[in-house]
């Protein structure tokens, strides 16, 4: 990828950063990719597409150190759980065998595993060596008859967040728009004017949480044409250009896809969240409004009233235990505000939230939820997090796995909220699961013991 192409990806017109006196998202600084490179960002964005073979072209470490670190669930194929790599070594680089190894790897994968498509991820070594991925992809596609698509996001291009952009850009240019959607089944109970097709962008089905939302959409006569990329299928993503509306779930990752689909196909979109009762209801209302169906609006309101009543009833045993509790939330992106909303729905107070991967719009939503004086943490080293905990007397820390031992060493209750978690927190059912996990975490009998003297002292 050329330098001007990278700069074009950094300059995102739909991003709130562009309204400031700078061009798009900030360029990476030396050493700033230590927490995740562009390759990692591209791979983690597309890896949930379950029927595609994801082939990493590079040394074994690039695949082995990053594979399957997002807990996206699949309702069907599990080909994406297999790690494929060309395993380039020193001799391959010296002898210039990278392109040949790549071609034979694609042919072997197609012959043995029969994927819907093959995605090839570029990494630093072949990018510096100058391997022509596009030429190899064209030759392999001709030889196998299966779509072979290059994802050019070598690690040294920039940060993990930058890597999301080329992955989405390739989907718009090479995948979406290549197939027409299947007709609605004849057994459907909805009249033609009540049927609506939508697309989901940046929804990754962590721990299967979108399966809490899918039945609600089915009940309303809303079909998800394609999801980019949670529980996704290659053929379904190809049909997303026919969606009547798109919902953007994580703006930092794939806002360029939502903007491009609006420009190319006129598809309206909005950014929403399924974390918490209020956010889920708002998302359903916004979908109904974008689809412009008065009957759908009425049915949506009836469904929301029913689900909110059921959720409130299920939350009663947990609310008293959580009301007034203080939490430090250190995450990023859409979760920096959407989880705040969910915790407030439970009667909790968020003393501070992390904004390391948040956009300006995310920060504005945080201020709307927490007030203008909201504490936002750009950096989250252990000392900073614990200082906030002690200053505001937080009852627990809610963050990603890398902060777990910071909390445990401070004898502080900890709940994992990031992509590695095993529990689904989205939707009306998810908020009940979140409340249960919070109560079990805070009320664990281990915490009083950690603060008491050992019996032999």
From Swiss-Prot:
One of its GO terms (biological process) is protein-containing complex assembly. Pathway: Cofactor biosynthesis; Fe-Mo cofactor biosynthesis. Gene3D superfamilies: Nitrogenase MoFe cofactor biosynthesis protein NifE, C-terminal, Nitrogenase molybdenum iron protein domain. It comes from the Bacteria. Disulfide bonds: none annotated. This is Nitrogenase iron-molybdenum cofactor biosynthesis protein NifE. This protein may play a role in the biosynthesis of the prosthetic group of nitrogenase (FeMo cofactor). It comes from Klebsiella pneumoniae. NCBIfam families: nifE. The gene is nifE. The lineage of its organism: Bacteria, Pseudomonadati, Pseudomonadota, Gammaproteobacteria, Enterobacterales. One of its GO terms (molecular function) is nitrogenase activity. Keywords: Nitrogen fixation. Pfam families: Oxidored_nitro. Belongs to the NifD/NifK/NifE/NifN family.
